[in-house]
Amino acid sequence: MTLPGLLQNNGIETVNSMKFSILAALVCALVSPLAGAQNYPSKPIRWIVPSTPGDGSDAMGRMIADRLSREIGQTVFIENKPGAGGVLGSEFTAKSAPDGYTMIVGNAGSHGVNAGIYTKLNYDVVKDFVPVALICTTPNVMVVNPSVKVKTMAEFLAYAKANPGKLNYASGGVGSSAHMSAELFKSMAGIDMAHIPYKGSAPAVNALMADESQVMVGNLPPWSALIKSGKVQALAVTTPKRHHSLPDVPAMAETLPGFDTLAWFGILAPAGTPKAVVTRINALVNQALEHPDVKAKLATLSCDPAPSTPEAFATRVTADVARWKKIASERNIRAD
């Protein structure tokens, strides 16, 4: 073969080799995530709870994690990272590898309210997370210590207006959904109460029971048994209509038309988590929510199972962020 012919053939072979290499790289890029998702999970999965043991996110996370562990052949374990109203656990999750092995049990406070009250977050509540699965929704409930001698919302409002500054209300931290719900209530009712923030909802509940504070607007689950036992007085749930678990407790909107704050709990992952992984965990959580044991447990906690798609959950998160940003701005509430 002549030299020009040899060079020509080598050139063709080189071009073909380059084409093959590029094609192989593209195939690998497409196949690798799918292969990883098919093998997922190949090790234990960590769910971060951005609050103390015993609060709503902790209870929901442990219940669903236990059910998933039985289904997938790997342990889904809870790791509590409380602090700054959910900021510490959220930041940790946002900066974790988006491989499906670290997710967060978020809520309306950590992934709704915080975007409005923190101006210096090291993560974006919307952009740095992908909503995976909504677990349940529940109203907040306004309760008072028995030392406050009232039985109805009308009696409470009359007492609060006659005794300005004498009532303290507890919350699980500045910017928690309990804090924001109470501030919205104060604004709409035209009353004055001092805020005492605690490091998590469990200490806040204990504080109200000890009469360190007299009032709390908190997620319904920790209060259900205490309300039904008569240890605290429930004045209203924070949804437009009464909740089926407490039919005798009025809706806040019956006294303050338009009042509506719904709490939610759900699983979110770091942005960039493979869609196949998100889809699988979503399906597993939705499946768990249909299990009789889970339904029964949610009923005892006064929570309504809320199976959903990742897209619908994302819409809820985005709407919550916009709403609480507006309320935080109007009430000049800042946590930093």
Which residues does each PLM region occupy?
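A ligand-binding cleft/hinge motif common to bilobed small-molecule-binding domains
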Residues: 111-120, 186-188, 215-248
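Bacterial N-terminal signal peptides that target proteins for export
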Residues: 3, 9-24
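N-terminal (or domain-start) structured segment
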Residues: 37-127, 166-168, 174, 190-215, ...
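An extracytoplasmic/periplasmic, membrane-proximal ligand-sensing/linker region
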Residues: 11, 42-44, 188, 228, ...
